[in-house]
């Protein structure tokens, strides 16, 4: 009997082998694309709102993938700054783009993970048999919403002085200062990390590395005299050449500390989406399968140091899948701030050469609700067939999320 048990154990696939297996019920990725990311307030999307960006993007997404829109049974779009997370206008954007009204819609807001939560929502619906095909993504216009006073939380006066409530209201930049102070992450290390992000992104742009993931879309620039100009947006506006730790070191801190405009993510506009299907449906319809969604995990952390979220979410998703850091070939950890990303990556022992290979949000920008989906569009081209990728981000009010996918 012991010998039989031993042989049985040898025949069972390990966690990595199991994840790489292909099954008819798998949630597969048929396509993942994004817009170029526009600079907030002065970039190519500054005159249009998120629903315009999303409509134009989805039109191009449908055209590029040649998907039959009638197959789409549900759409989940992440957004942070619109009222009600864009529930009305983003549903309208889907219809305007050619997705039929028969496709249901849900607006998702879990701060910076909203795009990933949209992917998780659609993937879980496919896993449970609710649907067989869905579209997940995110859209954000920080140019039009970032300074809107209506976005600020309004707290009941009876809770305004509650200590726990106050922690959830701490500005994100201050939480990053808390991380830097608590874990002794110097200004110099933050600037070095940020400079590497800029340099990697600049090289990627020069090499055309992002062209396969970006769908050029139409935008409109409104001039001061009221005239309008139509343009095509096809290149990220955040990356720039020649950034060094020394040049970043000359920037003044945004707060009383070490966080600057140079070592924090950029205010940005953009959209991204991932088309997910049940494997058996994708194969039956002849759609290409470029990846497989595996799992997403979210972990809570102290709100006052919310940036450490990936340091908790990544071990959680690895534990639930039985994988190790060594099993992961590429990591995309959102660079909300240099200090928090640097801390999280080091806590999990992420090899530097596997982290944000083409730069991250410090150089590219961070349209809040879009980032989680953007990471999928970015990481898939970086993976070879059979390799495993991991995406992660911190989340305002004290959380972190991480997900695992396989390239096929």
Swiss-Prot record:
Pfam families from the UniProt entry: Thiolase_C (PF02803), Thiolase_N (PF00108)
Entry-linked PROSITE patterns: THIOLASE_1, THIOLASE_2, THIOLASE_3
E.C. number(s) listed in UniProt: 2.3.1.16
Pathway named in the protein's UniProt entry: Lipid metabolism; fatty acid metabolism
GO biological process entries: fatty acid beta-oxidation; phenylacetate catabolic process
Catalysed reactions, semicolon-separated: an acyl-CoA + acetyl-CoA = a 3-oxoacyl-CoA + CoA
Record-linked InterPro entries: Thiolase, Thiolase-like, Thiolase-like_sf_Thiolase, Thiolase_acyl_enz_int_AS, Thiolase_AS, Thiolase_C, Thiolase_CS, Thiolase_N
Assigned protein family: Belongs to the thiolase-like superfamily. Thiolase family.
Stored PANTHER family: 3-KETOACYL-COA THIOLASE, PEROXISOMAL
Quaternary structure and interacting proteins, as annotated: Homodimer.
Protein's UniProt name: 3-ketoacyl-CoA thiolase A, peroxisomal
The species this protein was found in: Candida tropicalis
Phylogenetic placement of the source organism: Eukaryota, Fungi, Dikarya, Ascomycota, Saccharomycotina
């Amino acid at each position: 009997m012991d010998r039989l048990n031993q042989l049985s154990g040898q025949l069972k696939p390990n966690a990595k082998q199991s994840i790489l297996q292909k099954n008819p019920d798998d949630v597969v990725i048929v396509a993942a694309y994004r817009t170029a990311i526009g600079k907030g307030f002065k970039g190519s999307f500054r005159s249009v709102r998120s629903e315009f960006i999303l409509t134009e993007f989805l039109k191009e997404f449908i055209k590029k993938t040649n998907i039959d829109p009638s197959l789409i049974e549900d759409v989940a779009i992440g957004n942070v700054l619109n009222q009600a997370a864009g529930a009305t206008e983003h549903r309208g954007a889907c219809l305007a783009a050619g997705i039929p009204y028969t496709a249901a819609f849900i607006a998702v807001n879990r701060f910076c993970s909203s795009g990933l939560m949209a992917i998780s929502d659609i993937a879980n619906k496919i896993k449970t048999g609710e649907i067989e095909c869905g579209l997940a993504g995110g859209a954000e216009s920080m140019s039009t919403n970032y300074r809107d006073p209506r976005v600020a939380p309004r707290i009941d006066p009876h809770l305004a002085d509650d200590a726990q409530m106050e922690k959830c209201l701490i500005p994100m930049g201050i939480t990053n200062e808390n991380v830097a102070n608590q874990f002794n992450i110097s200004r110099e290390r933050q600037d070095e990390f940020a400079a590497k992000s800029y340099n990697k992104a600049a090289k990627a742009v020069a090499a055309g590395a992002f062209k396969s993931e970006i769908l050029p879309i139409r935008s409109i620039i409104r001039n001061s005299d009221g005239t309008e100009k139509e343009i095509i947006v096809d290149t990220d506006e955040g990356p720039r050449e020649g950034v060094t730790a020394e040049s970043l070191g000359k920037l003044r801190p945004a707060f009383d500390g070490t966080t600057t405009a140079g070592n924090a993510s950029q205010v940005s506009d953009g959209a991204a989406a991932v088309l997910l299907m049940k494997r058996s449906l994708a194969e039956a319809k002849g759609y290409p399968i470029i990846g497989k969604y595996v799992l997403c995990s979210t972990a809570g952390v102290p709100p006052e140091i919310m940036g450490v979220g990936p340091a908790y979410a990544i071990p959680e998703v690895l534990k639930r899948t039985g994988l190790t850091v060594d099993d992961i070939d590429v990591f995309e950890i959102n660079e909300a701030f240099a200090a928090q990303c640097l801390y999280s990556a080091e806590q999990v022992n992420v090899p530097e050469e596997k982290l944000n290979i083409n730069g991250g949000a410090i150089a590219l920008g961070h349209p809040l609700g879009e980032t989680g989906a953007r990471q999928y569009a970015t990481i898939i081209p970086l993976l070879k067939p059979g390799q495993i990728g991991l995406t992660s981000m911190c989340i305002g009010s004290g959380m972190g999320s991480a997900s695992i996918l396989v390239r096929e």
